[in-house]
A protein has these predicted regions:
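Glycine-rich "substrate-gating" loop/helix at the edge of Rossmann-like oxidoreductase active sites
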Residues: 71-74, 101-112, 132-144, 182-184
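Catalytic helix-loop patch of NAD(P)-dependent Rossmann-fold dehydrogenases
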Residues: 16-34, 38, 42-43, 52-98, ...
Length: 192
């Protein structure tokens, strides 16, 4: 089993250096896919992002919603990774689960993420920069919940065959997308 969590992350930096995202998130991931293909990996778990939903306005986000209009380079490269992994699943029977993580926070989190930026500002008595008057909502996911999602999915490699009559998460290729979220969007002003 291979768990691929490495990536060039972050929306803002992708605007400054899109090549870093292409190299890491597409070229780097293509190298992982090739290695998994040749090693006959029984299950690849790939860290994707809720940003893949892009311009989708249907809430709550569902794996069945379109993800064909990413709005940033970061999201486009992660969505591209999903497409690459689907091709490998279809062509080489590489069982792959793409996990779309939603705003992960917790210990050792990225310093550019809202939770750590807010905590740092509060700890140092600085004002918190809030966009949209704090009314926008995010589905924040604690890092331990991400670990649990990955751990639970490890033994459940997609087969390419529907598990039951209403299963649309297991297409003909042994590949699937699974949302990994807290399950309860929180308004930013309440989160702060």
């Amino acid at each position: 089993v291979v768990i691929h969590l490495a990536a060039q992350a972050g929306v803002r930096y992708s605007l400054e250096n899109p090549h870093a995202y292409v190299e890491s998130n597409l070229v780097g991931f293509a190298n992982v896919l090739e290695a998994c293909r040749h090693a006959h990996t029984p299950h690849l778990v790939y860290a994707s992002t809720s940003s893949a939903y892009g311009a989708n306005t249907r809430m709550p986000f569902s794996e069945h919603h379109g993800a064909d209009h990413p709005l940033q380079f970061y999201a486009a490269t992660k969505r591209g990774g999903e497409a690459l992994s689907h091709s490998y699943a279809a062509l080489f029977s590489l069982p792959t689960t793409c996990l779309r993580f939603f705003t992960v926070y917790g210990p050792w989190g990225r310093p550019d993420m809202a939770a750590l930026k807010f905590a740092d500002a509060i700890a140092h008595g600085r004002a918190i920069e809030v966009y949209g008057h704090g009314r926008m909502s995010r589905d924040f996911t604690y890092v331990a919940d991400v670990v649990e999602a990955v751990t639970r999915l490890l033994p459940l490699a997609p087969t390419g065959q529907p598990v039951h009559a209403h299963d649309t998460l297991s297409p003909a290729a042994p590949w699937r997308v699974v949302n990994s979220a807290g399950g309860a969007p929180v308004a930013l002003d309440l989160f702060i």
